[in-house]
Amino acid sequence: MAAPGPGEYFSVGSHVSCLTCLGQRLQGEVVAFDYPSKMLTLKCAPSSGKPNLSDVMLVNLAYVSEVDIITDRAETPPPLASLNFNKLVNRARAEKEDKLSLAYAVSAGVSVEGQQLFQTIHKTIKECKWQEKNIIVMDDVVISPPYQVDNCKGKEGSALSHVRKIVEKHFRDVESQISVQHSQQAQHTQDSALSS
């Protein structure tokens, strides 16, 4: 069965088995089914092997050669979980502020390094904003270009010390990533030369 015909659908909670066009056998519980797009969402056993997790697979039935219903839904599916709209609104507002902040930095001509440092600080300290090309943290610490530890200015105290530690760690991590990339490139070049 390639796809259900008109009026046919999969019940949420049913267990099905599908054979994809790539020969992969998928088996799981139906979480959702959209008839117009022929998309089936299955909750499958976890590929990680962790028992408290599940893999969620989206299956386009146009690319399935066979679908078997193993067990039909035995009872009424549980009601959908309620959504915390305040939490969703706050998350959307925070995402919007983050995107606007990034757009401001780009339009102000802030260097990529400055943008990356801002994002690193913002992960730890949400009270972080741009003032022209300067990063302002907790309204106490100003980091000006070129955004090094020596460019952190503010009242001596725990806030300045904490921000300096974040900046130091950020640049250590960046240096570490660069050295790993260089060693990988050198290894790749060496491997290419040996295979020639």
UniProtKB/Swiss-Prot annotation:
One of its GO terms (molecular function) is RNA binding. This is Protein LSM12 homolog B. Belongs to the LSM12 family. Residues 3-70 form the Sm domain. It comes from the Eukaryota. PANTHER family: LSM12 HOMOLOG. Residues 81-175 form the AD domain. It comes from Danio rerio.
